[in-house]
Amino acid sequence: MVRYRMRSLSERPHEVHGQQVYGQEQGHNGQEEQGLSPEHVEVYERTHQGYSHHRRRRCSRRRLYRIHRRRHRSCRRRRRRSCRHRRRHRRGCRTRRRRCRRY
């Protein structure tokens, strides 16, 4: 599966399976205006695209969801323990009303 970086429409035309609609030349011209020589343009693209893909893989939604769920469960357990520990004042238990401080 091929993943693309999110870009504004004015920055560069839409890419289809790694090939640009209007040709390869246009993207290079846009970056040369910023003061990059043609040799550095390819290195610049490679390093920045690689970096963004690496970050995206590390922080997937599924992984964040799993971590969040795990923390939530452990917090809920702690809250229950604190309520059970104070058996005398069960009616006035404030921990149920309060949200978990970790988030």
Curated annotation (Swiss-Prot):
This is Protamine-2. Proteolytic processing into mature chains is required for histone eviction during spermatogenesis. Transition proteins (TNP1 and TNP2) are required for processing. Residues 1-103 are annotated as: Disordered. One of its GO terms (cellular component) is nucleus. The modification Phosphoserine is found at S8, S10, S37. Residues 23-35 have a biased composition (Low complexity). Residues 8-17, 39-48 have a biased composition (Basic and acidic residues). One of its GO terms (biological process) is nucleus organization. It is found in: Nucleus; Chromosome. Residues 51-103 have a biased composition (Basic residues). Testis. Keywords: Chromosome, Developmental protein, Differentiation, DNA condensation, DNA-binding, Nucleosome core, Nucleus, Phosphoprotein, Spermatogenesis. Protamines substitute for histones in the chromatin of sperm during the haploid phase of spermatogenesis. They compact sperm DNA into a highly condensed, stable and inactive complex. Interacts with TDRP. Belongs to the protamine P2 family. It comes from Semnopithecus entellus. InterPro entries: PRM2. One of its GO terms (molecular function) is DNA binding. Disulfide bonds: none annotated.
